Curated annotation (Swiss-Prot):
The keyword DNA damage does not apply. Residues 22-52 are annotated as: Disordered. This is Late L2 mu core protein. The gene is PX. The role of the precursor might be to condense the viral prochromatin for encapsidation by virtue of the two basic domains. The record marks P14, S15, G144, F145 as: Cleavage. It comes from Fowl adenovirus A serotype 1 (strain CELO / Phelps). GO terms for molecular function: DNA binding. It holds the Pfam family Adeno_PX. Belongs to the adenoviridae pX family. It is found in: Virion.
Amino acid sequence: MCAVAIHRSDVVMPSVLLTGGRTAKGKKRASRRRVKVPKLPKGARRKRASVTPVPTVATATASERAALTNLARRLQRGDYAAWRPADYTSPAVSEAARAAASSGTPATARDLATGTLARAVPMTGTGGRRRKRTATRRRSLKGGFLPALIPIIAAAIGAIPGIAGTAVGIANLKEQQRQFNKIYGDKK
């Protein structure tokens, strides 16, 4: 139900229901009759909790929610051992490529842990020549890159209604951003 107030220059009187008392003449008494008003059903009488809609940029699918929940649990447990990057390749592939490049002949390598077999054929040349690249010095993060991911994941979880309350998610996000900036902020 929505109530709209319209402000005008003239005064509007409210509607009045007379249930008893004197009439305009003041001599006669109004009959004491009870006016029966139909009762509202019990469900309508109960005061509903006010619902505030929270706009979301994009809602996550059930699979995305499950993945984020799983990720959050693993972060809480500290289970980082089984993590692999999205572009993960078997060690057999890199070993076969390295052997083929250095020998100049086709090479095969097998990963005994997973059973992955990789074959590599050199494109051109005899191999053996390798250029040394000067490594650019990168600033190392305290505790590796995983602590840096925690606020991002927490923000993602906080942004999805159903996993965490939105207000709680926002409060946690602000605190985590503050801690993150305190540790990794611009230091010169």
